[in-house]
Every structure is written in C-alpha cells, then in structure tokens.
C-alpha cells in the first residue's frame, strides 16, 4: 500500500447524500476479483448522463472526492473502495460515512475525512475552481484561501496510512517477533511441530 502524507489537487465537488455502494460501483462489477480497471465502473450509472462531473476534463485525475452525509451506505462490498482507488481517489471528505465503507477505504489506502456540513459546503465552493489539500500529518484540510479545517482520525489508522501498511505489511513489521515466538514454541511444545516437520 502506498504511504500517504499529503493529498493535494483538485477535488470532485459531488456533494450527494446517502450514496450507497451500488451507486459507487454497480453489482455487475462484483464478478471480478481484480482491482485493476474497476475505475471504469465507478459511478457508472451517473456517468451515463452527458456532461457528468466524473468525466469532466476539469476534474480528470482529481485525488479527492467531496460527498454528502452517509457516504458509502448499503452493502459492504469492498469493490467500492477498489473502484474509487482505481479512479485515482485517495481521500473522501463528507459529514459522515458508513462504518463498513470507512473500514474498507482505510484498508485500501483511502483517507475518510469527517467534517461539519458547513466545512464541507465551503470546500464544495472552493473545489469549483481551486485545489485543496488533505494533510494527514497535521490532520487538517487546507485551501488556497487560508481555510484550515481540522479532522479526527484513529491513531492506528493514521500510523498505517502514513507508513503504507496494509494488513500484510503490518504483520511483516512483526516478522522478528513472530519468528522468535515460533522458535520458542518448537522448544516448549515440540509435540506440536514434530509431525508437521516429518510431513514436510
């Protein structure tokens, strides 16, 4: 997982409330188990409308998405996070998120930023023409107009995102401790490993 410190650039001022995971990525995209190419399915039904914001050249490659209350509600499909990531989104800002979506986003290296409705509205306004930045180190969202909006994030999640640690990467940071434990287990409880070693 790529380490994150600051995410800066244009933000897609979407703003819709109660956006469920079926809107983020329709069910027929769930047949795939690969993450590559899922960005084509992100907001597919909305992109069928001409001049939609997700296909606008102005917001091409935008790393930030601004949404409304309860973003990511509905089914728990992890493909929703995969699709956003493949679209290039590294941070989503909203007044609230579905807990399951927020967890899936974190596990895939997407920062979910909770701000007040007033702050989200202000960022929606700025995003129409100017970039914004999400600073994970200082836990603030800033604009070119001196707006500084602090946000909360779980310390463990912050550590993992800053260091690019997914579940596998986090386990590997404890590799020496795991090896030490396994060595002690072989000595203290040899009957647990003898049969396995013979089979190997």
Curated annotation (Swiss-Prot):
Q: Which UniProt keywords apply?
A: Amino-acid biosynthesis, Branched-chain amino acid biosynthesis, Leucine biosynthesis, Lyase
Name the EC number(s): 4.2.1.33
Q: In which pathway does it act?
A: Amino-acid biosynthesis; L-leucine biosynthesis; L-leucine from 3-methyl-2-oxobutanoate: step 2/4
- Presence of the UniProt keyword Lyase in the record: yes
Q: Which reaction does it catalyse?
A: (2R,3S)-3-isopropylmalate = (2S)-2-isopropylmalate
Q: Where is the signal peptide?
A: none
The GO annotation for biological process reads: L-leucine biosynthetic process
GO MF annotations for this entry?
A: 3-isopropylmalate dehydratase activity
Q: Does the keyword Secreted apply?
A: no
Sorted alphabetically, the Gene Ontology cellular component annotations on this record are:
3-isopropylmalate dehydratase complex
InterPro entries given for it? 3-IsopropMal_deHydase_ssu, Aconitase/3IPM_dehydase_swvl, AconitaseA/IPMdHydase_ssu_swvl, IPMI_Swivel, LeuD
The superkingdom of the source organism is Bacteria
Family per UniProt? Answer: Belongs to the LeuD family. LeuD type 1 subfamily.
| Protein task | Catalyzes the isomerization between 2-isopropylmalate and 3-isopropylmalate, via the formation of 2-isopropylmaleate.
Checking PANTHER family in the record gives:
3-ISOPROPYLMALATE DEHYDRATASE SMALL SUBUNIT, 3-ISOPROPYLMALATE DEHYDRATASE SMALL SUBUNIT 2-RELATED-RELATED
What is the recorded name of this protein? Answer: 3-isopropylmalate dehydratase small subunit
> What species is this protein from?
Erythrobacter litoralis (strain HTCC2594)
